[in-house]
Design a protein with these regions (language model features):
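Small-residue-rich loop/turn and linker elements
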Residues: 62-63, 161-163, 209
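Polar-ligand-bearing catalytic/cofactor-coordination segments
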Residues: 142-199, 223-227
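Post-HEXXH active-site segment of zinc metalloproteases
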Residues: 196-227
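Interfacial helix-capping/hinge residues at the ends of transmembrane alpha-helices
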Residues: 22-25, 184, 218
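Juxtamembrane transmembrane-helix termini
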Residues: 29-30, 57, 131-145, 158-161, ...
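Hydrophobic transmembrane helical bundles of multi-pass organellar membrane proteins
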Residues: 34-39, 153-156, 168, 208
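Hydrophobic membrane-embedded segments
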Residues: 1-130, 134
Length: 227
């Protein structure tokens, strides 16, 4: 389990470089179509899912394995971020954790801290999954009495703002007080979200956020994906 945790950490670190690159590209491509935005974040998603990475001198990812999987057993623990400046700051701190060479029976403190961090990570993942399940259940109950307007469009007195719910068969939910041109405009907007498969990408993005919840850049990436 500790090895899986370290792999997740490494994938998250590698994806962070891509997030920074996407943020820069978003500034350059402000007027690009919406699908370009989804494509850019899709590249980040692939890196968060796939443990394999291709490194090169031109790669945006300096190192695919910043933290060695056997670091907790290393006599002198070090990382390789691919950025010398970062290594020069972090590695001396890690080395200070190592027990003196003449003390052979002392455990590497990382053998203690990594399992603890692993447990904290699992608690975070479990908490977010539980929050998601409860929120989805409450939302389904909220629109349980919704009335069909037409096709996959429903209206409910319990809805205050429009939204799309469902992955396989997405439905558009609207408040009852919406009608006329406003209603048609909102429906067209929500249908555009469905055509772009936002009802797929956003749940996928949140699932990845659940796994990489400890990384602030992933929260920023998810917020920007949902815009």
């Amino acid at each position: 389990m500790n090895e899986l945790f370290l792999k997740i950490i490494n994938m998250s670190i590698s994806a962070s470089w891509l997030v920074v690159a996407v943020l820069i590209l978003r500034l350059v491509l402000k007027k690009a179509p919406k699908w370009v935005n989804v494509l850019l974040w899709g590249i980040v998603a692939v890196r968060l899912i796939c443990p394999l990475s291709f490194e090169s001198a031109l790669s945006l990812i300096p190192s695919s394995e910043t933290i060695p999987l056997d670091i907790e057993m290393a006599v002198k623990p070090t990382i390789d971020s691919g950025v010398p400046a970062i290594n020069s700051v972090v590695n001396p701190v890690l080395s200070s954790f190592a027990p003196p060479q003449h003390v052979l029976t002392s455990a590497n403190p990382l053998q203690i801290w990594i399992p603890i961090l692993n447990i904290i990570w699992l608690i975070g993942v479990g908490s977010l999954l539980l929050y998601t399940a409860v929120s989805y259940w409450r939302l389904c109950r909220k629109v349980d009495t919704a009335v069909r307007y037409k096709d996959n469009i429903f209206q409910s007195e319990n809805v205050s703002s429009p939204f799309v719910l469902g992955i396989i068969r997405p439905r558009i939910y609207l408040p009852f007080n919406m009608n006329g041109q406003d209603l048609e405009h909102v429906v067209a907007h929500e249908q555009a979200h469905i055509r772009r498969k936002d009802h797929w990408w956003k749940p996928l993005g949140f699932f990845l956020l659940t796994i990489h919840w400890f990384n602030p850049l992933m929260w920023l990436a998810y917020v920007l994906l949902c815009r």
